[in-house]
């Protein structure tokens, strides 16, 4: 006993790969293990990886067909079970050598997942246990029993979704208790001897002996698959419950099984109970659940559904039932195959997710609470997608999600599950993703407040090496992110090290701790660890401080340079940081970098200490004489702060005070305020005696009167003298020989003071000219004194500016992409496209003369001479001399609106110059033919004229379009006031041979057109419908488009008709409906054929005129929205609708052409902004019913009217808010109910504003035409019906904030009533006998309704 073989020994043992020779759809990948029962392999299929289980057929008489049918039935029953993964296919292949089972491949089963990092935490264990019970419940409800639930058959995806697989209904239900051969053969495939089989499935071996007569042969298996004995015992639900309980117990004991075979048999007999294993389950609710599930008596075990109800709020949190299970189930559907789609869906739902998962967390709860809030389950979904994301926007969205969720997650989740993926993103191919990953990593690590034992070396061994390459990244944006975050990274790394050290010290001081030997050794010496950390960070900081891009250095200084000082300590802050920062002042071309230095130096100096003042003094002085005034302001602020902190020695303070005092008269307001701030701080720092003895002498020249409270800013500001004029200051500062200028100004000052008897005029004519210019700009003696006070600053600044110009010539470009026109001596030119009032000619002449002297020859070759009109041009002999005297030569207005002088003679002129002016460059005018004019014009002027003409045309087109939109009318001929059609049939037209799809009326209502599935378009004369003529036949028929014509529309303000067929053809037809004796004609003008695979056929179309464009807008079945410009035969715009929202069924365009709205087969109404071609909003019908027809509301600009499938519902939606405002309900069903006992729908709608009281005509599948009075709904009525319809009434009510007008049938009276008015004589019904497909109106001498139906009939009513 126990040694018998569980199967017939095969004559030939084949490898699992050999069975794939006859299978063409599957390619062998690798073996997943083999047992005597099954050989298991992984194979490749076009839809992904699959698991193939091969059963080698040794006995041809086995009834495999019945097993196959059973598996097929099981697959059908489990079709809707989202936590079950049955075999998708069962086949007998390989020349009947084997039977094969196929199912989707999932990488991990629960047995593997329990022992795989990152280990499952408590909330994940609960979630998996919850799903196991849910899967069992999903299987049991349709009558399926598993038969072999074990950890190897519970698959767990990368996002912790449980799939119960390998349903084993074909395995024996009962096993002999005294022979393990059958158990080993069928159930112990892992060879672990672990047993999950319910004890009642083991029976006395004698039962088998009485039925089997083959016991004499010891090689015969006790259980024969070919006999009927396996069907004797039916699998019970309680058996699966026991197995599931064993799996849940193993899950919560971290892989310790409840039973092996011998223990289970002992448990069956009451000789064993797994109390020791159950006590390892810490949670009381789970332990109680498992104990009930593994009860020895099957009757004492409950159903899976009962356990789920029992443990709701106990073992399983309420959020599993209310949110997580339904939300996570959507990702298990086939529609969510893309990782990018999952991330975008989660980002969209993030607010709702956090509200559901974290809304119960209160501020007073402990810090441990977030670990149990279920967010980790969502994190597993996010992290499972990260490595397979394709698009960079999805990757950025994923990083954004991590950043939002990180503050609500525990430490181990952040370190074990989030950090590795962030380091993965730091190697992404897109620079923006690398940069954002680094920022996110820094912020996530900063949230870690404690360090687990296994992560004590995470920074030096994992994080810093993982991002080290980013400091030398090719993309500046990545290095910028590194510089921005390295201070926080260093600070967090130091905190990690200190937390570890503190934890070790606490453990050493704890005498009861048994882990001292394990902890103190690996950590090593704190100083050694700190030094290694300093070296790693220092290497990257030095790399960033030496970066070729200044913006990287600037970012490093602006983002935590002081924190880096604290990290490195005083010595390294001085040796590493300060020494590199000083070099930034050598860059004379980037004042932003110099300014950032002074912004950052205060924090560094404060940490290094007052010893640095001697080093910083020349740097600060250099900042006070910088060429850029913004840098001076920042230097003043830095000095003020350092003085406040006591970082400046007193001699240095007075020295700086003498340098800064002249700034009190600087023309820059910020500099003056900065100087005042420094002076007031110094006054507070020194004694009163020093204020008046040492500080006041510096201030006296710049204040109007003596003051006492120098330390108050407002007081000092109120007594300051007027600053130097900005124009005088700038002119003097820009002069080339500023030293000689100040020498002469000093001599003039000495003369005023009486030190010199006389001051001779300057010998240098340039200085004389400069002085004359300054005096002409209003320089007074006080201004001269202030300039002399600023002498040292101005000379240094002048020299600094000269150095900048010199350096700019040494380099190709001081800044990439920047051209300094001022440095190159180029004067800008501009032409106003809008005419302004002309200046007097004499002023304009002076301005042009001044500018022309600086214009080079290349500029002249482009624009011609800049000689003003009053300059003597090359005048021909005999020309009017008044031109010279008045300065007004003959002028002509060019087509572009530019005034240009004209020459009137072909002779070569003389070259002349202006009197009392420096000679200007002469310009010769060209020789031209007699009796013509020569316009002195060059290439740039020609292009300028073309630009102006183009702008004028564009402006004119926009003005026309605006006028058209402002004057847009809903319809050219609205129904007459008080129009209420009586339902009298005027014309019955049966020319079409198949369903009529659409009716359209021309703008002036003289024609209306119909299109049909018979491939024809028929044009009819509206005038003939009044009954004054004998015939009402169509005047034109067009049938050359091919296919079934699905839609058509008239072009605004014309007799052009656009039609579209289901064969992809779109044609524009011209209609000549002339009066007699000429016969009407129709001919095609333009056409295009759409790609049926890419676009599909057109489902709806509209036309509108936008002034510059005549746009035919059409929507296709594959989601394309195209605006075809009929004037240029090209597309004005193209929009792409996402087919996830359903196929487009109809669309409508705003009357002002600002937006359009599309309706889909899934009930979605999506709006697009037509100006920017961007989606605006999207709203969905509550029942997701198909949108059959859309129309804009005539009064409310943001409303659309939508006819939807079922209940004859027509609703008016506010697309701005997504609210359903008004509903017409012609159905016996309760209003706004999502149930649809009435299948009838509205197929055609017509709406008119009707002088502020809008009316609506609807018609559809119930073959009735209804007139809806939207202002007075009670006045609505049925215009015409298919038969003698019962009378109806209309009532208004408010339901859930929506105003509903419901049609209710009146009760029929028993006998005939003479009081009931009749709409017409008692005759055959004149209404339609098939679905009405469309409705329209036209006006001649009275109003008419025209309807069409699916049987090809067109009827006209009045």
UniProtKB/Swiss-Prot annotation:
Modified residues annotated as Phosphoserine in this record: 808, 813, 853, 865
GO cellular component, one term: phosphatidylinositol 3-kinase complex, class III, type II
Disordered: region residues: 875-899, 1307-1326
WD repeats: 991-1030, 1040-1079, 1093-1134, 1139-1178, 1182-1223, 1237-1278, 1327-1358
Swiss-Prot/TrEMBL catalytic activity: L-seryl-[protein] + ATP = O-phospho-L-seryl-[protein] + ADP + H(+); L-threonyl-[protein] + ATP = O-phospho-L-threonyl-[protein] + ADP + H(+)
Compositional bias of kind Basic and acidic residues: 1315-1326
Entry annotated with the keyword Transcription: no
Locations listed in the record: Late endosome; Cytoplasmic vesicle, Autophagosome; Membrane
Subunit: Component of the PI3K (PI3KC3/PI3K-III/class III phosphatidylinositol 3-kinase) complex the core of which is composed of the catalytic subunit PIK3C3, the regulatory subunit PIK3R4 and BECN1 associating with additional regulatory/auxiliary subunits to form alternative complex forms. Alternative complex forms containing a fourth regulatory subunit in a mutually exclusive manner are PI3K complex I (PI3KC3-C1) containing ATG14, and PI3K complex II (PI3KC3-C2) containing UVRAG.
Name of the protein in question: Phosphoinositide 3-kinase regulatory subunit 4
Lineage: Eukaryota, Metazoa, Chordata, Craniata, Vertebrata
Underlying gene: PIK3R4
């Amino acid at each position: 006993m126990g040694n018998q073989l569980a199967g017939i020994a095969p004559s030939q043992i084949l490898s699992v790969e050999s069975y794939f020779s006859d299978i063409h759809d599957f390619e062998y990948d690798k073996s997943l293990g083999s047992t005597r029962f099954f050989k298991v392999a992984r194979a490749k299929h076009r839809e992904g990886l699959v698991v193939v289980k091969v059963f080698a057929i040794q006995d041809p008489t086995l009834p495999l067909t019945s097993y196959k049918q059973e598996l097929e039935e099981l697959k059908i029953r489990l079709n809707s079970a989202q936590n079950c993964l049955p075999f998708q296919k069962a086949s007998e292949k390989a020349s009947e050598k084997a039977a094969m089972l196929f199912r989707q491949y999932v990488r991990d089963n629960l047995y593997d997942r329990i022992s795989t990092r990152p280990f499952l935490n408590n909330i994940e264990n609960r979630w998996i246990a919850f799903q196991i019970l849910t899967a069992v419940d999903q299987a049991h409800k349709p009558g399926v029993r598993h038969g072999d639930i074990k950890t190897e058959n519970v698959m767990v995806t990368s996002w912790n979704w449980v799939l119960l697989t390998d349903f084993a209904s074909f395995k024996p239900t009962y096993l002999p208790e005294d022979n393990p051969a059958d158990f080993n053969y069928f159930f112990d495939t892992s060879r672990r001897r672990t047993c999950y089989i319910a004890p009642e499935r083991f029976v006395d071996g004698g039962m088998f002996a009485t039925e089997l007569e083959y016991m004499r042969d010891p090689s015969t298996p006790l259980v024969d698959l070919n006999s009927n004995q396996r069907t004797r015992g039916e699998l019970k639900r309680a058996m699966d419950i026991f197995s599931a309980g064993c799996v849940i117990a193993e899950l919560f004991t971290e892989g310790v099984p409840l039973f092996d075979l011998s223990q289970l048999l002992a448990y069956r007999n009451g000789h064993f109970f797994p109390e020791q294993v159950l006590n390892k389950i810490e949670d009381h609710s789970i332990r109680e659940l498992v104990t009930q599930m593994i009860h020895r008596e099957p009757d004492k075990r409950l159903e899976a559904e009962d356990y789920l109800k029992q443990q709701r709020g106990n073992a399983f949190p309420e959020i599993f039932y209310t949110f997580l299970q339904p939300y996570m189930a959507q990702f298990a559907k086939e529609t969510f195959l893309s990782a990018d789609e999952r991330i975008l869906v989660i980002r969209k739902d993030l607010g709702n997710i956090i509200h559901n998962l974290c809304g119960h967390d209160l501020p007073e709860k402990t810090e441990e609470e977030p670990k149990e809030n279920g967010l980790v389950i969502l994190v597993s979904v996010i992290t499972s997608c990260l490595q397979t994301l394709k698009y960079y926007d999805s990757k950025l969205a994923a990083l954004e999600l991590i950043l939002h969720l990180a503050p609500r997650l525990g430490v181990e989740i952040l370190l074990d599950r989030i950090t590795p993926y962030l380091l993965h993103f730091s190697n992404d191919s897109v620079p923006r993703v690398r940069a954002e990953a680094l920022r996110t990593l820094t912020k996530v690590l900063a949230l870690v407040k404690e360090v687990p034992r296994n992560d004590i070396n995470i920074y030096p061994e994992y994080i810093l090496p993982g991002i080290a390459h980013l400091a030398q990244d090719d993309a500046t944006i990545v290095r910028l992110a590194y510089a921005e975050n390295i201070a926080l990274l260093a600070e967090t790394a130091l905190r990690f090290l200190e937390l570890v050290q503190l934890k070790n010290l606490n453990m050493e001081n704890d005498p009861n701790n048994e882990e001292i030997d394990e902890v103190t050794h690996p950590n090593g010496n704190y100083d050694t660890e700190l030094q290694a950390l300093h070296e790693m960070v220092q290497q990257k900081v030095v790399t960033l401080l030496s970066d070729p891009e200044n913006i990287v250095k600037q970012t490093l200084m602006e983002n935590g340079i002081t924190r880096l000082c604290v990290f490195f300590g005083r010595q390294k802050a001085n040796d590493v940081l300060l020494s590199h920062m000083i070099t930034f002042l050598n860059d004379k071309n980037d004042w932003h970098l110099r300014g950032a230095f002074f912004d950052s130096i205060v924090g560094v100096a404060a940490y290094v200490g007052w010893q640095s003042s001697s080093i910083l003094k020349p740097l600060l002085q250099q900042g006070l004489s910088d060429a850029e005034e913004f840098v001076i302001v920042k230097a003043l602020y830095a000095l003020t702060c350092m003085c406040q902190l006591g970082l400046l020695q007193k001699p240095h303070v007075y020295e700086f005070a003498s340098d800064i005092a002249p700034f009190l008269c600087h023309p820059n307001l910020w500099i003056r305020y900065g100087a005042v701030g420094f002076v007031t701080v110094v006054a507070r720092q020194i004694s009163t005696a020093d204020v008046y003895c040492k500080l006041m002498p510096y201030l006296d020249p710049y204040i109007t009167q003596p003051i006492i409270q120098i330390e108050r800013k407002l007081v000092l500001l109120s007594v300051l003298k007027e600053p130097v004029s900005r124009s005088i200051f700038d002119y003097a500062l820009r002069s080339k020989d500023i030293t000689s200028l100040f020498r002469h100004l000093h001599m003039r000052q000495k003369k005023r003071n009486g030190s010199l008897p006389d001051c001779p005029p300057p010998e240098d004519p340039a200085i004389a000219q400069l002085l004359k210019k300054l005096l002409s700009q209003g320089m007074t003696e006080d201004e001269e004194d202030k300039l002399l006070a600023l002498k040292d600053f101005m000379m240094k600044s002048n020299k600094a500016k000269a150095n900048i110009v010199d350096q700019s010539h040494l380099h190709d470009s001081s800044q990439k992409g920047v051209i300094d026109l001022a440095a190159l001596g180029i004067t800008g030119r501009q032409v106003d496209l809008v005419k302004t009032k002309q200046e007097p000619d004499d002023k304009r002449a002076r301005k042009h003369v001044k500018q022309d002297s600086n214009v080079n020859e290349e500029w002249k070759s482009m624009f011609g001479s800049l000689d003003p009109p009053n300059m003597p041009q090359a005048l021909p002999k005999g020309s009017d001399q008044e031109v010279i005297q008045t300065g007004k030569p003959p002028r002509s207005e060019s087509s572009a609106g530019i005034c240009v002088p004209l020459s009137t003679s072909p002779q070569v002129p003389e070259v002349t110059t202006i009197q009392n002016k420096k000679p200007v460059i002469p310009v010769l005018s060209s020789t031209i033919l007699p009796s013509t004019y020569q316009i002195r014009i060059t290439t740039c002027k020609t292009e300028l004229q073309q630009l102006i003409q183009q702008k004028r045309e564009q402006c004119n087109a926009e003005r026309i379009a605006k006028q058209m939109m402002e004057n847009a009318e809903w319809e050219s001929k609205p129904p007459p006031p008080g129009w209420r059609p009586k339902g009298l049939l005027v014309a019955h037209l049966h020319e079409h041979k198949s369903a009529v799809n659409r009716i359209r009326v021309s703008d002036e209502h003289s024609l209306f057109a119909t299109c049909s599935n018979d491939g024809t378009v028929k044009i009819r004369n509206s005038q003939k419908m009044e009954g004054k003529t004998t015939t009402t036949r169509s005047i034109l028929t067009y049938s050359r488009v091919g296919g079934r014509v699905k839609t058509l529309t008239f072009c605004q303000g014309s007799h052009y008709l656009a039609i579209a067929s289901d064969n992809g053809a779109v044609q524009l037809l011209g209609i000549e409906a002339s009066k007699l004796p000429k016969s009407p004609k129709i001919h095609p003008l333009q056409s295009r054929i759409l790609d049926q695979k890419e676009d599909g056929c057109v489902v709806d179309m509209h036309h509108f005129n936008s002034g510059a464009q005549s746009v035919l807008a059409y929507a296709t079945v594959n989601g394309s929205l195209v605006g075809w410009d009929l004037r240029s035969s090209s597309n004005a715009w193209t929009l792409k609708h996402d087919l996830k929202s359903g196929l487009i069924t109809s669309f409508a365009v705003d009357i002002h052409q600002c937006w359009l709205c599309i309706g889909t087969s899934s009930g979605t109404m999506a709006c697009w902004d037509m100006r920017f071609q961007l989606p605006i909003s999207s709203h969905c019908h509550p029942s997701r019913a198909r949108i059959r027809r859309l129309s804009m509301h005539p009064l409310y600009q943001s409303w659309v009217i939508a006819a939807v499938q079922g209940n004859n519902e027509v609703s008016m939606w506010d697309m701005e808010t997504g609210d359903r405002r008004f509903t017409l309900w012609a159905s016996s069903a309760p209003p706004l109910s999502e149930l649809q006992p009435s299948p009838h729908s509205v197929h055609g709608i017509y709406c008119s504003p009707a002088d502020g009281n809008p009316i609506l005509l609807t018609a559809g599948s119930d073959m009735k035409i209804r007139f809806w009075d939207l202002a007075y709904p009670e006045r609505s009525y049925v215009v015409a019906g298919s038969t003698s319809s019962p009378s109806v009434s209309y009532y208004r009510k408010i339901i859930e904030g929506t105003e509903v007008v419901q049609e209710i049938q009146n009760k029929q009276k028993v006998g005939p009533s003479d009081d009931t008015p009749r709409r017409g004589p008692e005759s055959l019904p004149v209404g339609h006998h098939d679905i009405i497909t469309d409705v329209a109106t036209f006006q001649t001498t009275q109003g008419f309704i025209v309807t069409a139906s699916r049987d090809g009939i067109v009827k006209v009513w009045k």
